[in-house]
Amino acid sequence: MMSERALTAFYGGTFDPIHYGHLRPVIALARLVNLQRVILLPNNVPPHRPQPVASAQQRLAMARLAIAELPDPIFTLDERELQRPTPSYTVDTFEALRREYGPDSPLAFIIGQDSLLTLTQWHRGLELPALCHLLVCARPGYDYGLADERDNRWLARRLTRDPQALHQQPAGLIYCAATQQLAISASDIRARYREGRACDGLLPPSVQGYIDAQGLYR
């Protein structure tokens, strides 16, 4: 049973398509920091990357299929960003979530190392720790340093190695997890489908079946 102050983590992305590179590191992260709930936040209009190939409803369907296959029931979905016609700015979403969950509930946003390195380029990106913790999953080829020394000092003030601290305050900390680094990307999977190459082992079988049935990424 979930306590009233249990840490709730959100994981955003286009999920075009959702794959094991999304899921397995987050499952490992959940074990490291004792997450009882991870809520996927599919983007509608991502402001920092090309627009998705699959429609919002197709990406939502693939996410549902993927989490239904997982043995751990911690994953759920939040469709709010798919219902916005405007860009999916994370800070706007977390301002709304903070109002909903209240000032004392621990909230976290899961990102990859690549996203941490570009956080200063996000819309009000450095304001996020005022609203939530940041949980950072390792990514191949990236480190944890920011380009600017002042930004590195900003990062250092918020870093924690104590997973329990994430449960004891509502926001403000950055936890960098040594999760498994998987060289799986949605762009590579889309290219494989275009070129007729196999994608076995890269994404859940039910998602593969959906892609085939819908004729996606051809």
Swiss-Prot record:
Its EC number is 2.7.7.18. Pathway: Cofactor biosynthesis; NAD(+) biosynthesis; deamido-NAD(+) from nicotinate D-ribonucleotide: step 1/1. It comes from the Bacteria. Signal peptide: none annotated. One of its GO terms (biological process) is NAD biosynthetic process. InterPro entries: Cyt_trans-like, NadD/NMNAT, Rossmann-like_a/b/a_fold. It catalyses: nicotinate beta-D-ribonucleotide + ATP + H(+) = deamido-NAD(+) + diphosphate. CDD domains: NMNAT (cd02165). Pfam families: CTP_transf_like (PF01467). Keywords: ATP-binding, NAD, Nucleotide-binding, Nucleotidyltransferase, Pyridine nucleotide biosynthesis, Transferase. It is an enzyme of class 2 (transferase). GO terms for molecular function: ATP binding; nicotinate-nucleotide adenylyltransferase activity. The keyword Nucleotide-binding applies. Catalyzes the reversible adenylation of nicotinate mononucleotide (NaMN) to nicotinic acid adenine dinucleotide (NaAD). Belongs to the NadD family. This is Probable nicotinate-nucleotide adenylyltransferase. The lineage of its organism: Bacteria, Pseudomonadati, Pseudomonadota, Gammaproteobacteria, Enterobacterales.
